[in-house]
Amino acid sequence: MNNFKYLLVGLAIFNFISCQNKPSLQSEYVEGNALGTSYHINFYSEKSENWEQGFDSIFEVVNKSMSTYLPNSDISKINKGNKDVKVDQMFREVFNLSKEIYANTDGYFDPTVGNLVNAYGFGAEELNELTEKDLDSLVSLVGFKDFYLTEENHIQKPNKNSYLEFNAIAKGYTVDRLAVYLESQGVENYL
């Protein structure tokens, strides 16, 4: 009989604990434009807040660092020949990851093809009429192996006309930063 009392008390405690109010998750949906495209983010959160402000701050920092479409971004300054630009942590991470991918693909992934991309009208500049000589000249500027990150966090490039762009990797990197932000806010499920 004593065991039965303990069982009833245990079940009552379990029932009380399991029926307590848990914070309810709210479905959140945020959409907008950034990095030259649109984005849509679905997630569940216990708190309702101005999520756009947090997302926009991430987009702003990424753009300031790596957008070839913004003339005052760090990468645009580097592409114009400014050797004094001290790159931030995000730029360094993307640069080093690009070096790794460049090596693992035997150079097929190369973030220095920007001059060619622009010449064909796919980048930040307008399409130009190209001769074979022009193409040869542009191809000679391609080669990520000759770019270096110095200990002082400056980019050393082989030719003042070499052009660096992370468009093939920056959007994915930004998604990773958004995920870190959401998780830091207690969000576990997001898309």
Regions found by a protein language model. Name each.
Residues 1-7:
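Bacterial N-terminal signal peptides that target proteins for export
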Residues 16-167, 180-191:
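A contiguous, well-ordered beta/alpha segment that forms the leading edge of an enzyme domain
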Residues 171:
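Short, conserved phosphate/pyrophosphate- and ester-handling motifs at nucleotide-, phospho-/glycolipid
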Residues 174:
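Short active-site segment of divalent metal-dependent hydrolases/proteases
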Residues 8-15:
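Bacterial N-terminal signal peptides
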